Amino acid sequence: PSHRDGCCKTDRKEQAEKILRKIGGEEYANEQIASINESFAEETSSHSIRDLFEPRLMKIIGLGIFIAMFQQWCGINVIFNYAQEIFEAAGYDVSGMMLNIVITGIVNLVFTLVAINTVDRWGRRPLMLLGSGGLMVTYAILGSCYYFELKGIIVLAVVLTAIACYAMTLAPITWVLLSEIFPNRVRGTAMSLCVSALWIACFVLTVTFKPINVALGASGTFWLYGVICLIGFLVLYARVPETKNKSLEEIERELTKSS
């Protein structure tokens, strides 16, 4: 969509029409060009901050903010930020903790690269649901490991599973969704709000982990993150449509219609 829209936006309409005809034929190309022109007309017309408070747009922006905050509040970053404490509680010494931290970084990198191939093959919605559901189950197991005082390799295996699940789903796909769900006329402002919300959520997650861990213990903390992932799964299932192979205009219409 970005290449196609870019051609229209830079007056390379013949190139855009050629691309669209190759995709879906003459009638499809004409419909898409008309839809794109209408979208750009809205984008270039005068808009104010009050447009963000239109009820239908507020629901879309609210969904975007939820997606951004959920990417952080799913809890995975506490594993990166507090890896020493987590592995220490699992019975590892200093050398073991350092090795495990290196392994978690490698797993994160590998499965981030995997996401490059799966985002268009599997779709955005299935990957977001896989990530939230997978983390929910993984946290339930990890919390149980701490509750029953299981230590060593089993805890490492569960932690690596959580990191792999996050790296190929919620971590990259959140940014893909946020770039696609907003109407052109408010996309810049809406993205700014979502990015701000994401970093605020990251800060809150980081500063609350230790107090929560003291109050609930390692098991209760990860069970709590599991409940948050359950809530995220339910909201994503109910509110987020599949955006794969859809134009930005189709996504906008679907979201405003459902909202």
Question: What is each of the regions a protein language model found here?
Answer:
Residues 1-21, 34, 40-259:
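Alpha-helical transmembrane bundle of multi-pass membrane proteins
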Residues 22-32:
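Short intracellular "coupling" helices and adjacent cytoplasmic loop segments at the cytosolic face
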